[in-house]
């Protein structure tokens, strides 16, 4: 069928999106530890009695203040316990989707008994690291995840090593679909979006379905900081206009409210983050509805948004001091601009203005307040699009923005990769001091 019309670069683009845009139930950092615990528990006969876990500072940062779905509790210990007692290790980022009420109760009892310990891995050279060691009597099993939220690199039990990842995994990364993104450009991504057969990218509509459902749930319930529902009330009071800009703000923040507040609905994630997936999806959906886009046009806009977000985030550490809702919103800006205008110059100007606007937003851990940053990023994206439609943008004479968008992206990402490392350490120190 359509495979014969797709060149190798386009195939890599599609595979990259399929790798990075996946359903995820719950914030992905605690879920990574839950997955390690579930995979370790699968190696034991019988019920886990005790858990020791170790995580990297960045994973600790993103796991301290976020609600684990179905538990009403925050933090890594409940994620580890529920993963071990009710998780499905084969479900990846949806490891907790089938956890029963009994498993939740048993996990809470395990915590209350003091049988779960989560510690910093020291020293730790990996930005994303989670290890869970589970015990039953004299038996134990240990699973280590490194580099990516679901990348199991080692499984070991009291009987010996069960699995260890091949040493050439990093070399294979260079030729993987994600590795190809290091040698492409936004112009090539746009050419792909404009010409790829619809059937080859129809799958991206699942992002609209899942994240749209989260948005509706966020408006129905009182999740997290309930930013979306609060702003909707202000519309009814006449304090906010009921217009397209407000709809983008409300519906995007509502999805993040539900996500961070512990709703038992999956998000379609991007680059290992549900909030990035929400930010790359919902603003584009709202604009698509406004312009009356059909499924094909929506799919192309979503593909541009998600692939642009992946392209930018691929130049960043998996976790850093930079709030990646901002980079996901750059993808959303591309998708929204494409729906209205379609020109590369408009898309490039919108992204450049985003870099000149929200590039300094820090990540101070996953929490309900992420919805604030998601809403800010979504609003900034729409503002940047409106400016670009009038042929206006932050120029290369200003700040870190360069005269071409590719260099602007590189400048932004170099900040996160180098200069913001000390910022990240300071954020983690501040958060750790609050925990004591």
UniProtKB/Swiss-Prot annotation:
Organism per entry: Salmonella schwarzengrund (strain CVM19633)
Family matches, as PANTHER family: UPF0597 PROTEIN YHAM (PTHR30501:SF2)
Protein name according to UniProt: UPF0597 protein YhaM
Family to which this protein belongs: Belongs to the UPF0597 family.
Lineage, top ranks: Bacteria, Pseudomonadati, Pseudomonadota, Gammaproteobacteria, Enterobacterales
Single biological process term from Gene Ontology: L-cysteine catabolic process to pyruvate
Pfam family, one: SDH_alpha
HAMAP family per record: UPF0597
Domain of life: Bacteria
Gene Ontology MF terms in the entry: L-cysteine desulfhydrase activity
InterPro entries, per database record: Ser_deHydtase-like_asu, UPF0597
């Amino acid at each position: 069928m359509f495979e014969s019309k797709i060149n190798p670069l386009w195939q890599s683009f599609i595979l990259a999106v399929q790798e990075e845009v996946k359903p995820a139930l719950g914030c992905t950092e605690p879920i990574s530890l839950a997955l390690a615990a579930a995979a370790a528990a699968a190696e034991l006969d019988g019920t886990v009695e005790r858990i020791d876990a170790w995580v990297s500072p960045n994973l600790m940062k993103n796991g301290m203040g976020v609600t684990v779905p179905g538990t009403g509790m925050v933090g890594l210990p409940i994620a580890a316990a529920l993963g071990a007692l009710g998780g499905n290790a084969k479900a990846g980022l949806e490891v907790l989707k089938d956890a029963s009420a009994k498993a939740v109760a048993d996990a809470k009892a395990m915590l209350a008994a003091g049988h779960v310990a989560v510690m910093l891995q020291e020293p730790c050279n990996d930005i994303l690291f989670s290890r869970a060691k589970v015990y039953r009597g004299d038996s134990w099993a240990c699973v280590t995840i490194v580099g990516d939220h679901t990348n199991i690199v080692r499984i070991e039990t009291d009987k010996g090593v069960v699995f260890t990842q091949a040493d050439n995994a990093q070399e294979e990364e260079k030729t993987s679909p994600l590795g190809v993104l290091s040698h492409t450009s936004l112009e090539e991504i746009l050419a792909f979006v404009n010409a790829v057969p619809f059937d080859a990218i129809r799958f991206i509509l699942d992002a609209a379905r899942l994240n749209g459902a989260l948005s509706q749930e966020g408006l129905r319930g009182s999740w997290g900081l309930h930013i979306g529902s609060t702003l909707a009330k202000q519309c009814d009071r006449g304090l906010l206009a009921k217009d397209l800009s407000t709809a983008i703000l409300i519906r995007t923040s509502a999805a993040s409210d539900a996500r961070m507040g512990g709703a038992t609905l999956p998000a379609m994630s991007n680059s290992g983050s549900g909030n990035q997936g929400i930010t790359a999806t919902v603003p584009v959906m709202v604009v698509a509805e406004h312009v009356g886009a059909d499924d094909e046009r929506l799919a192309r806009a979503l593909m541009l948004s998600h692939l642009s977000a992946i392209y930018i985030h691929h130049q960043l550490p998996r976790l850093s001091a930079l709030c990646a809702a901002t980079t996901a919103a750059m993808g959303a800006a591309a998708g929204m601009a494409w729906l209205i205008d379609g020109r590369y110059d408009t898309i490039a100007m919108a992204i450049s203005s985003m870099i000149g606007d929200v590039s300094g937003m820090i990540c101070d851990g996953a929490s309900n307040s992420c919805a604030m940053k998601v809403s800010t990023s979504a609003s900034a994206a729409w503002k940047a699009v409106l400016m670009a439609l009038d042929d206006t943008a932050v120029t290369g004479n200003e700040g870190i923005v360069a005269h071409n968008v590719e260099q602007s992206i590189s400048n932004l990402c170099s900040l996160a990769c180098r200069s913001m490392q000390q910022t990240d350490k300071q954020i983690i120190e501040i958060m750790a001091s609050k925990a004591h």
